[in-house]
């Protein structure tokens, strides 16, 4: 059954798509906004780079990016394992009571990263960040349900969880020594402990110091329980739920507070908005994220058609501009412009409108005049924010003046002013001064902000950075809205003055139309106020300090870090926007998870900033390896290892190609941070990495001529028992008065004279040491039970090449080559002769390395388990370990109590 013509039921807005009449069914305004904003950004960027370099200007998939961020929230940066990693292993020699104990952490670390080249600083940065991330990953583990066994009524640790591998040495030990080892293993008693009212197992094991520092920091983070942080988070979520009309669900509180549950809070709420807004060139990306995560789905509804029929089109013959446009139907493109208008209204100051150049519509005076009238009632132009540009405001003023001077009904007295500016005249019998409707961005006269306080501060908002509340048309967003009754009897200054001016100009029919449209108009802006102040309030909302200066900067033409997005609309779309209202029909699906998305994003940004701050110090600490380094190198290195969704958000507007060094260094120096478990572990990893030997990087590499030992085998049994080996690892640095420091300048000077090799030969003949600069080198560890390859034995701590070109000789010197620490274990048989290891010509080795870390030690049987001095805490098998970060969601979205 069809609705009666006077039914007070809003109807969706039809539009022409080609030659077919179509209707909206809840279009995703967020996706449309992304496309339009990106279209504008692409247009500007393509002009910037037309004569320079190519930039990827494809529109990113925002939904895919947000899904990726949500997956980051579900990822855990720690591992739950039953046994720690093996930290020490033993290399067996022919001796029965002497072995080489190897710290396996340094072995694994030496394999991480690429070769360092002083001419490619980006590789050095990438290597360092990979090593730091490797350290953080190795140490971030939680012990749970460790394997144990019973020994004479005592619970003892299984040998696999002690961190020392003794399996390789047991077969070669004597029975007495095996009994000694077994006695120590049987003494690894598991003690019962209590951490934060939870029962745990405590035992002593072995662990590399660097890995243990990360593990200990993680364990301390968990043991701190963070009850106060959780209370603050829950309280804040309740505040946010009240602001956004959502219910915070506390179902998970019953579960995780059970005594058999260990809970981990890896993220903190709320996110620090300053972290999000400090990112270089972030305003458009944050605007898009705000739209995508918060903007509700809605339809365009029309007012009661009887309003126009009893006012504008009541006569059979209608010649007025409003009557001409009343029966028109928008095209798909024009309805897109209507969406742009509502986007600008929902994001005042951030999105502003301008009139597109369309000669066809400019030739239609009726369209321009109608748009000039309703534009003054739809848009705000000061004093606190604006929806339109100065050019558009002036064009609307001209169009309004044309409408007032368009005498289609009767002659009205007009008295012109002296300036010739738009609206500089008095009209009507009462001589209404139309100057008050000319745009003035300082006072807001002539538009919706005229005589109103449309930005106010009331109760504290959940997000500290955005305390403003928008009040279009002086409507309080806390009011309940019922379309059938809301707006009746309401008014505001600009609307009243428009009615007075229309009556003075003899436009009684149009004045009657606007009187009847007032309730619909007030409902429209009441909905917009609610969407802005409730749904769109998030960490991605523009900070108040930046919002407050947008208008002033635009008026004076000053460029700041945050500039508005300008969207182009057509004249007639202003009329269609006035005749339609955006009605939310479904709240955003990601509204309840938006705080978690913000926290994950802010946490990742903080970790990236921490990495960049640490890398910015490297060039000052090690200038020889970073001669050609620039801040862009460590920026790219950190971006390379950052999660893809975070990089995609930062580059939503394809702005990374335009970030300069000033932007980077300014961001790195800002103090804003977002606390999280990941940041705590990252900072601890960098604290460990301050000693670069922990990353298997060293600058203590020397050139020294040393003869490879060739011992006589006079007593083979004693030789085997002592476990003879040779290494190029020094126990201490050489005497400083015997060391010659070769800087790049000295080496280049002698190379230019063609005397580098001769100079080094003289130093070697004097049995002195040469240290080539202070460059950091990657160190590898290798073990050999036979003669190492010649490329290792004869390796030099520098690369020196010469070539001739055009009659000139060029020399290339590089210091940052890989260095190998090798251990040569001598194995002999009883059948060997005394001179079996002696060669006629001795073998010389040229590279020596000194490191303070004891990577390899020769130990006796009694020292094999002496490294079991680290305290491990393991959660019992019947305890549950639960990461409650995913539970920190706002909860259930409430239906708006206004329909």
Curated annotation (Swiss-Prot):
Keywords: Virion. Its main location: virion. GO terms for cellular component: virion component. Coiled coil: none annotated. It comes from the Viruses. It holds the Pfam family Orbi_VP3. SUPFAM superfamilies: Reovirus inner layer core protein p3 (SSF56831). The VP3 protein is one of the five proteins (with VP1, VP4, VP6 and VP7) which form the inner capsid of the virus. This is Core protein VP3. It comes from Epizootic hemorrhagic disease virus 1.
């Amino acid at each position: 059954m069809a609705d009666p013509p006077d039914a007070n039921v809003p109807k969706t807005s039809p539009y022409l798509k080609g030659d077919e009449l179509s209707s909206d069914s809840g279009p995703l305004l967020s996706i449309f906004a992304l496309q339009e904003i990106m279209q504008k950004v692409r247009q500007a960027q393509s002009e910037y780079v037309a004569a320079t370099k190519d930039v990827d200007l494809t529109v990113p998939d925002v939904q895919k990016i947000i899904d990726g961020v949500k997956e980051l929230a579900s990822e855990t940066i720690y591992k739950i394992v039953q046994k720690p990693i093996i930290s020490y292993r033993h290399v067996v020699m022919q001796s029965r009571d002497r072995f080489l104990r190897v710290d396996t952490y340094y072995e694994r670390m030496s394999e991480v990263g690429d070769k360092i080249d002083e001419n490619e600083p980006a590789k050095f940065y990438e290597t360092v960040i990979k090593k730091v991330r490797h350290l953080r990953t190795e140490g971030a583990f939680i012990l749970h349900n460790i394997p144990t066994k019973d020994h004479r009524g005592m619970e003892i640790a299984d040998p696999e969880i002690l961190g020392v591998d003794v399996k390789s040495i047991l077969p070669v030990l004597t029975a007495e020594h095996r009994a000694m080892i077994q006695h120590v293993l049987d003494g690894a008693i598991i003690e019962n402990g209590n951490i934060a009212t939870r029962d745990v197992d405590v035992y002593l094991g072995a662990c590399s110091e660097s890995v243990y520092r990360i593990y200990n920091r993680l364990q301390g983070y968990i043991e701190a329980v963070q009850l106060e942080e959780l209370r603050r988070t829950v309280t804040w979520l309740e505040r946010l739920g009240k602001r956004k009309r959502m219910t915070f669900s506390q179902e998970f509180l019953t579960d995780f507070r059970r005594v058999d549950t260990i809970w981990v809070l890896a993220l903190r709420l709320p996110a620090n908005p300053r972290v999000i807004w400090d990112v270089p060139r972030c305003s458009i990306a944050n605007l898009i994220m705000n739209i995508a995560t918060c903007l509700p789905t809605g339809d365009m509804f029309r007012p009661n058609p009887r309003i126009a029929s009893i006012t504008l089109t009541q006569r059979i013959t209608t010649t007025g501009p409003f009557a001409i446009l009343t029966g028109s139907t928008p095209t798909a493109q024009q309805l897109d412009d209507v969406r742009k208008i509502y986007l600008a209204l929902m994001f005042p100051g951030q999105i502003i409108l301008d009139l597109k150049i369309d000669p066809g519509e400019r030739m239609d005076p009726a369209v321009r005049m109608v748009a000039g009238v309703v534009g003054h009632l739809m848009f705000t132009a000061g004093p606190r924010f604006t929806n339109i540009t100065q050019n558009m405001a002036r064009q609307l003023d001209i169009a309004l003046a044309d409408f007032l001077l368009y005498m289609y009904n009767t002659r009205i007295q007009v008295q012109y002013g002296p300036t010739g500016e738009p609206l500089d005249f008095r009209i009507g019998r009462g001589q209404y001064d139309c100057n008050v409707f000319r745009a003035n961005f300082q006072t807001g006269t002539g538009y919706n902000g005229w005589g109103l306080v449309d930005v106010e501060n009331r109760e504290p908002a959940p997000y500290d950075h955005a305390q403003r509340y928008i009040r279009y048309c002086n409507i309080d967003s806390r009011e309940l809205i019922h379309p059938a009754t809301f707006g009746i009897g309401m008014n505001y200054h600009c609307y009243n003055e428009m009615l007075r001016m229309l009556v003075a100009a003899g436009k009684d029919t149009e004045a009657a139309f606007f009187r009847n449209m007032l309730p619909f108009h007030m409902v429209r802006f009441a909905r917009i106020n609610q969407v802005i102040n409730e749904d769109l309030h998030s960490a991605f909302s523009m900070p108040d300090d930046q919002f407050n200066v947008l208008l002033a900067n635009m008026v004076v033409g000053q460029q700041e870090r945050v500039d508005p997005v300008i969207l182009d609309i057509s004249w007639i779309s202003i009329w269609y926007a006035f005749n339609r209202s955006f009605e939310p029909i479904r709240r955003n699906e990601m509204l309840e998870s938006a705080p978690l998305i913000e926290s994950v994003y802010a946490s990742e940004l903080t970790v990236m900033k921490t990495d960049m701050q640490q890398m910015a110090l490297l060039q000052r600490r090690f200038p020889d390896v970073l001669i050609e380094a620039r801040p862009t190198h460590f920026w790219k290195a950190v971006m390379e290892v950052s999660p893809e969704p975070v990089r995609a958000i930062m580059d939503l507007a394809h702005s990374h190609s335009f970030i300069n060094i000033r932007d980077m260094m300014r961001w790195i120096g800002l103090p804003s941070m977002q606390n999280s478990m990941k940041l705590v572990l990252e900072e601890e990893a960098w604290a460990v990495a301050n000693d670069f030997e922990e990353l298997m990087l060293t600058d203590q590499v020397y050139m020294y001529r040393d003869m490879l030992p060739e011992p006589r085998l006079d007593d083979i049994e004693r030789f085997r028992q002592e476990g003879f080996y040779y290494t190029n690892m020094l126990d201490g640095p050489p005497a400083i008065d015997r060391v010659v420091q070769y800087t790049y300048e000295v080496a280049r000077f002698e190379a230019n004279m063609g005397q580098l090799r001769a100079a080094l030969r003289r130093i070697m003949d004097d049995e002195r040491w040469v240290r080539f600069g202070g460059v950091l080198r990657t160190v590898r560890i290798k073990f050999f039970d036979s003669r190492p390859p010649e490329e290792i034995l004869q390796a030099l701590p520098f690369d020196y090449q010469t070539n001739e070109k055009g009659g000139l000789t060029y020399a290339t010197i590089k210091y940052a080559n890989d260095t190998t620490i090798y251990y040569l274990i001598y194995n002999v048989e009883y059948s060997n002769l005394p001179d079996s290891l002696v060669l006629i010509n001795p073998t010389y080795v040229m590279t020596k390395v000194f490191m303070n870390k004891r990577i390899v030690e020769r130990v006796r049987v009694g020292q094999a388990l002496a490294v079991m001095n680290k305290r491990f805490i393991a959660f019992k098998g019947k305890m549950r370990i639960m990461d409650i970060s995913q539970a920190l969601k706002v909860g259930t979205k409430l239906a708006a109590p206004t329909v």
